[in-house]
Each structure stands twice: as C-alpha cells, then as structure tokens.
C-alpha cells in the first residue's frame, strides 16, 4: 500500500481536467417543465400555508406565530416559552466553543435522570396558554403611534407601541394550554431558542403523536421542504440558466473536509430525489432524440467501510446481496430512502436517537464487529499521531484530539466519517470519472459527461449511442479494483455493485443494467 500522498495529488490533477470538461458541457434545462414544476408546487405551498395558519389559530388562539421564527416554532410545538435565554443556554451548555482552531458545538449537560432534566426545564420555561386578543387602544391596533411634539403638533415619526409590544393586540390568557404539547426527551432536543424543530426531530415524534398533531407535523414538514426546494433548486436553477437553456455548475475538490466533490451556481450535489420533489425532470438531453444515462454505485460507502475495516460480515452480506438499507428500513418501519441516514449513523459511530434507532445502532455494532473494532483503531491512531491515513495515501489531521472520560475521543464522528466518505468519493469515484472520459474520447463517442453526484455519474447520451454509452459507463465504473492496484499499490477487493438507468430526463428512468459485483 502507498505511504505517500503523491498518488492522490496526481489523481486530483487528472480529475481537474475532467471536471473542467463537465463544467463546460453543462446540463440542458427544459424551461417549460421547470416552470410547470414551479407553478404546481407554489400552489401546494399556498394551500399548505393556509392550512397551517388556520391550525395555528386553533392551537394558539389569538397569539401570533411566525413559522419562519425558530423561537415561535418552539413555542408552538412544545407549548413552553423560555424565560431567560442566557440562563437556558448556560444550564444546558448550548452554543459553540473553540477546540483548537475549530468552532465545535459544546458538549451538552449530562443529567442524572430524565426527571432532573424536566425539573430544570420547568424552572427555566413557562407553559403557554391560548389567548384572546383585543385591540390596543394606545395604537388603535397598528402597533405604532404618532409621537406628539412639545408644541402639541404630531411628529412625522411613528414610535413602537410599548403597551402591546408593537403587536396591535393585547392578550389575555384562557385556561386552555396552547400548542402541540410535544414533550422534549433529552438535552439534545434543546436549542438556543427553546427546543429544536428541524425535520429530523419532528419526524421522530410522528410515531407517538395524536392524529391531529401528526397531521400538522406532516404538513409543516412538507411545507418547509417545498419552500427549500423552490428557493434552492427552482429559483437557483432559473437564475443560472443561460440563453441556450444550459446551466454550468462549478465543481470543487477543495471545499469539503473529506475531499468529496461539491458544486455551486447552482448546487447539483443535494438535488432531491424524485419521490420528494421532481425537479430532476427538467434535466433533459441537449441532443434531439438523446437520452440521460446515470450510473450509481450500490451501497458504496457501506462497502468501503467493510473494505477499510476488513469486516468479514460486510463482505459476506455483499456477496449474498443483502440490501443493508432495506434491512434497516424493516427494523425501523420506514422507507428505504429514509433508512439510509440510519444505516450510515452507526457506520460513523452515531449512538443517539429514538429508543428504536438506538436499538438498531447497537445491533449494527454487534453484527459488524469488524467496523466497530476499526473505529477504535482509528481513534487510537488519531490520539497517537494526530492524523489518520488512508491506504490511498490521503491523510486527515486532528491536532487537538483528546480522550474523553466516556472512553471515546473528541472529533469522534469526523474520525470515523472522513476515511469512509473520502476513500469512496475522493479516491474511488474520480477513478471512474477519469476512465470514463478517456474511454469516451478513445471510442470517438459524442456522448458526454454532464454531472456527477457523490457516488453517481450522469451522461448526456447522443442518439444511436445508447448501447455504446451503457457499455462504456459500465466498464469505467467496474474498473476500480485494477486501477487501485495501479494507482495506489493495493487491490480493492470488495465487490463493486453498480446500477445503470436510462431515460428521457433525469427523473423518469428505467434500469438497463445491474450488477452486485
């Protein structure tokens, strides 16, 4: 195995040329489809907003709630309001701190029992009740009043009404508790404004929520997602489209800590899957009669972890075609796509979650004991040398790593995550991209590479070159084992699984080839 970083530098230099070609090639956007997607989901957004506003009034009475405000959402969802934010942050140790030269989240306060946690919450936050609002007579419901000068004439300046705190209404409490009454489960649920209201946290409450609360949570999660999709992907894409209907994202090798590629203007790395938001449908071929071909590596990071850890159980499961994401989904009772994040959590040393998730994480650690052992070795390596080294020669430095009383180390997640993500997407995928570009040129094909996303490669296929493009992409993606030996001095012995899909656009595609390796 290589001990130097030269092979990874050479790979990066070769990849730079390929990425330059991909940027120049760009992707073709069907603007009619993009516009129809925008119109459809803007309508859904309006309908969701009306539903949510009506329900907020039902849950809160006349108390105004701004769903864009983390503090207001915390009040709405948890029915409590923090009385002293500074003391709250201090008691639960919320915020960031410098560890070496890096800002990291503070380690949260550890309570002896859940009862102690609730006692602390109740001492620093007050319950919220539904309200009845009446017009503030001081400002006549405007929230501001006209300041009178000393000579008795009205000023042109309107001042904030302190009587109603600029709300225009005066509120009196009813006897009924307001909000959705979610119950925080541990200190991780706490935030600077009260309690967390992100998608992952809210989804974790769905299984125990009443029908009424469940419906509201689902609608809010959908509302938040659509807003993000419209702003980030539709609006971002529309701004980036050139006169010829193309977008040319910029690809960068030096932004992420792991070496994984990132892109901007617009960002194509976090493009939503079709079952959540169909923006991929507007990505079509630039060629009349052309197709879009995508090649995906199957469970690449899971297989890479098994290879780096020399975990025999991973190799056995891969050879027996065990779908680890489906296995996770069955245990947790969620979709395969949603299960992916839970599959990867123990892969990177994750231990926190719902009781069901934590049970799965423990089962994962026991089943894949080779990965568990390897995690300990990585931590020890980081402690001894302040760095970890991949067989490719790539190195990650952790100058301020320390042993914790729990037996773990600081930067534990990064120490376990970086080698897997880095080797998979910074050391292996570029090999396939470079080989693919060389093969397309050698075979004089007009088909071009137009995108790459983490562990996949996207081609714009010239008419009548479909079969040649499939064969060429398959050959490039399956070349990892021999190429690793040639470039890095070792053989990648884990079976390489790939799946190829072809379609008229990047969303509506049919499988044309699949191999487990």
What are these model-predicted stretches?
Residues 17-20, 24, 131-161, 165-170, ...:
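Conserved catalytic core of nucleic-acid polymerases
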Residues 36-71, 364-373, 464-517:
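Polymerase palm active-site segment centered on the conserved acidic dipeptide of motif C
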Residues 2-4, 22-23, 27-35, 215, ...:
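Glycine- and acidic
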Residues 1-274, 289, 358, 362-363, ...:
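Conserved "right-hand" nucleotidyltransferase catalytic core of DNA-directed polymerases
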Residues 249-335:
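Function-dense linear segments that define catalytic or interfacial modules
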Residues 25-28, 43, 59, 83-84, ...:
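Secondary-structure transition/capping motifs at alpha-helix termini
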Residues 297, 455-457, 498-500:
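A structural signal for short, well-ordered beta-strand segments
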Residues 78, 304-307, 508-514:
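Short conserved micro-motifs at the rims of enzyme active sites and ligand-binding pockets
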């Amino acid at each position: 195995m290589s001990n130097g970083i030269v092979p990874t530098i050479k790979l990066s230099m070769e990849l730079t040329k390929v990425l330059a070609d991909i940027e120049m090639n760009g992707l073709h956007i069907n603007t009619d489809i993009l516009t129809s997607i925008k119109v459809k989901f803007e309508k859904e957004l309006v309908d969701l907003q009306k539903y949510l506003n009506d329900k907020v009034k039902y849950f809160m009475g006349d108390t105004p709630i701004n769903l864009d405000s983390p503090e207001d959402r915390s009040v709405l969802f948890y029915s409590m309001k923090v009385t002293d934010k500074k003391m709250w942050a201090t008691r639960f140790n919320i915020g960031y701190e410098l560890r070496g030269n890096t800002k990291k989240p503070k380690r949260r306060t550890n309570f002896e029992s859940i009862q102690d946690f609730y006692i602390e919450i109740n001492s620093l936050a007050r319950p919220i009740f539904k309200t009845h609002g009446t017009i503030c007579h001081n400002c006549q419901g405007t929230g501001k009043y006209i300041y009178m000068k000393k000579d008795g004439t009205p000023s042109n300046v309107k001042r904030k009404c302190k009587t109603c705190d600029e709300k225009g209404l005066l509120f009196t409490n009813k006897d009924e508790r307001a909000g959705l009454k979610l119950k925080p489960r541990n200190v991780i649920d706490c935030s600077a404004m009260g309690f967390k209201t992100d998608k992952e946290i809210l989804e974790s409450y769905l299984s125990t929520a009443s029908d009424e609360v469940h419906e509201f949570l689902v609608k809010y999660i959908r509302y938040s997602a659509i807003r993000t999709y419209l702003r980030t992907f539709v609006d971002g894409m529309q701004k980036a489209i050139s006169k010829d209907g193309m977008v040319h994202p910029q690809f960068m090798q030096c932004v992420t800590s792991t070496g994984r590629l990132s892109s901007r203007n617009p960002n194509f790395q976090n493009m939503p899957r079709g079952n959540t938001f169909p923006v991929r449908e507007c990505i079509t071929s630039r060629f009349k009669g052309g197709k879009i071909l995508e090649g995906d590596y199957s469970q690449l990071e899971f297989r890479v972890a098994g290879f780096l850890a020399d975990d025999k159980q991973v190799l056995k499961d891969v050879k027996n075609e065990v779908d680890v994401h489906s296995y996770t989904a069955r245990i947790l009772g969620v979709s395969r796509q949603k299960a992916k994040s839970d599959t990867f959590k123990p892969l990177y040393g994750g231990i926190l979650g719902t009781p069901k998730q934590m049970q799965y994480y423990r089962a994962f650690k026991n089943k894949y004991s080779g990965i568990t052992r390897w995690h300990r070795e990585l931590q020890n390596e980081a402690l001894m040398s302040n760095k970890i080294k991949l067989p490719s020669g790539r190195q990650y430095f952790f100058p301020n790593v320390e042993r914790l009383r729990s037996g773990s180390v600081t930067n534990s997640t990064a120490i376990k995550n970086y080698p897997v993500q880095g080797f998979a997407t910074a050391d292996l995928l570029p090999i396939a991209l470079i080989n693919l570009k060389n093969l397309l040129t050698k075979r004089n094909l007009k088909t071009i590479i137009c995108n790459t996303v983490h562990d996949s490669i996207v081609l714009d296929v010239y008419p009548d070159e479909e079969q040649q493009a499939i064969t060429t992409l398959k050959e490039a993606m399956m070349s990892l084992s021999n190429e690793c030996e040639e470039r890095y001095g070792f053989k990648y012995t884990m079976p390489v699984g790939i799946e190829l899909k072809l379609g008229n656009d990047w969303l509506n595609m049919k499988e044309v080839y699949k191999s487990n390796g």
